[in-house]
């Protein structure tokens, strides 16, 4: 049987294939004992053995002595090795290696679709959900940082999303014999490891966390794509855009691929790439702060001013107290319009998102005021409602600050007419894709409102 080396661009001296030399078996045995003595419950894994073989083979002439575990950490149960590559040249090499693999294996990637467990965990962040979309090179180069970032998900209200393409690429790399070598022998204790070993560690980490619904990590569903035919870098960017535009998330791309990061930045998607001494907590904290800075006001303004607006309007000097009959009609029309608005928004969002409704920043229990409802229209304007209002002059920003007369119970006849006419127009747009039966029910309701208003104006 012959050993075939995988093709790789010329001029790169970081990748090489090596075979196991039986003469170092004693060193391997001793290294396994060293690892077992340091690991919880004396555990060691197949990946540890792979790592020791590569490490011992490449360093047998350097006089290594029992340092095979290097800078490798493990998860809490001691099952999955976690490491970060701290040398910038190594990180760049991994990125270039994966780019070359994407060019060579584009067709095979397109034809392979592994099934993954991607049920959504129940998270309730205070603002738009932060979604870290992770590239293959980031998993291979910075698995330890990713694990720490995942462990902070409940504290900083974020998710890590693994695109389908990344799972495919890791699966294709798991048998690669090529070695990611650290050149700086004097300052870095990381040992040579094969790309296949690093890919298997990444696969194990993804599998373990996908099996846990509360892990803070999910996989991209096959239907969660704007362009299902996209490949390689474009498919990862497509994943980012889906979660940004359709599921209304605050998306941050984790990648060391400069070309992919450039594409993401042109789409207004923030990116995080390798930096010396990169820290997961700082990444999580800054992402949370940026989320708050950009989107907190959307929710803060929803409820706080409603009661104040109604009260201040009701006590403006000079407004006459309407007769009892007007009060009754105004109250009935106001409540019925409000409930119809709530129904239209809830129905539209559920029809658009289906089973993903629990993932978006929508809570039907908070549909308690017209101001709340208008904020949901504002929040989902780009992804849902703008299409319904194509022929309307109403713009997105107008939903953020509707006049009080359009949000509260009318206190005089002119305000009641204005209120009814505005929401009649809006409801026609909201119902534009409803069934004919639902549209007929709306027209019947509108007719009753107009009849009641006309009755008290004569």
UniProtKB/Swiss-Prot annotation:
Its main location: nucleus. One of its GO terms (cellular component) is nucleus. This is Transcriptional protein SWT1. Residues 130-262 form the PINc domain. GO terms for molecular function: RNA endonuclease activity. The gene is SWT1. It comes from Saccharomyces cerevisiae (strain ATCC 204508 / S288c). Interacts with the TREX complex and RNA polymerase II. Deletion causes a slow growth phenotype on synthetic medium at 37 degrees Celsius and leads to decreased transcription. Deletion has no effect on ribosome biogenesis or frequency of recombination. Deletion is synthetically lethal with a deletion of each of the THO complex subunits HPR1, MFT1, THO2, and THP2. The keyword Transcription applies. Involved in transcription. Probably functions as a transcriptional activator. Keywords: Activator, Nucleus, Transcription, Transcription regulation. It is found in: Nucleus. CDD domains: PIN_Swt1-like. Belongs to the SWT1 family. One of its GO terms (biological process) is nuclear mRNA surveillance of mRNP export.
């Amino acid at each position: 049987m012959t050993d075939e080396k995988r093709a790789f661009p010329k001029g790169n001296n970081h990748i090489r294939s090596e075979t196991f030399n039986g003469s170092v078996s004693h060193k391997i045995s001793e290294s396994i004992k060293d690892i077992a003595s340091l690991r919880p419950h004396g555990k060691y894994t197949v990946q540890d053995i792979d790592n020791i073989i590569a490490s011992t083979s490449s360093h047998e002439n350097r006089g290594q002595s029992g340092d095979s575990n290097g800078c490798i950490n493990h998860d809490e149960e001691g099952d999955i090795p976690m490491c970060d590559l701290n040398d910038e040249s190594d990180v760049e090499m991994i990125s270039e290696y994966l780019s070359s693999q994407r060019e060579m294996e584009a067709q095979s990637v397109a034809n392979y679709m592994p099934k993954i467990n991607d049920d959504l965990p129940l998270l309730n962040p205070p603002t738009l959900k932060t979604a870290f979309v992770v590239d293959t090179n980031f998993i291979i180069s910075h698995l330890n940082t990713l694990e720490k970032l995942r462990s902070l998900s409940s504290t900083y209200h974020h998710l890590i999303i693994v695109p389908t393409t990344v799972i495919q690429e890791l699966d294709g790399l798991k048998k690669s014999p090529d070695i990611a070598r650290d050149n700086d022998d004097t300052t870095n204790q990381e040992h040579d490891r094969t790309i296949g070993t690093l890919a298997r560690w990444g696969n194990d980490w993804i599998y373990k966390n996908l099996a846990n619904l509360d892990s803070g990590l999910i996989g991209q569903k096959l239907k969660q794509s704007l362009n299902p035919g996209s490949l390689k870098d474009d498919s990862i960017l497509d994943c980012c855009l889906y979660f940004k535009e359709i599921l209304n998330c605050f998306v941050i791309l984790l990648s060391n691929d400069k070309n992919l990061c450039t594409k993401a930045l042109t789409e207004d998607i923030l990116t995080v790439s390798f930096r010396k001494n990169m820290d997961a907590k700082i990444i999580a904290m800054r992402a949370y702060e940026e989320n708050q800075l950009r989107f907190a006001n959307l929710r803060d303004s929803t409820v706080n001013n409603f009661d104040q607006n109604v009260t201040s309007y009701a006590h403006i000097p000079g407004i006459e107290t309407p007769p009892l009959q007007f009060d009754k009609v105004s109250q009935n029309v106001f409540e019925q319009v409000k409930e119809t608005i709530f129904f239209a928004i809830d129905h539209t969002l559920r029809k658009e998102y289906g089973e993903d409704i629990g993932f978006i920043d929508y809570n039907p229990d908070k549909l308690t005021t017209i101001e709340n409802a208008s904020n949901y229209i504002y929040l989902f304007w780009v992804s849902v409602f703008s299409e319904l209002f194509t022929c309307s002059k109403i713009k997105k920003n107008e939903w953020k600050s509707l006049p009080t007369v359009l949000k509260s119970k009318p206190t005089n006849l002119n305000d009641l007419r204005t209120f009814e006419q505005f929401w009649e127009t809006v409801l026609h747009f909201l119902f534009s894709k409803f069934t004919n039966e639902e549209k007929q029910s709306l027209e019947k309701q509108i007719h009753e409102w107009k009849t009641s208003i006309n009755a008290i104006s004569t």
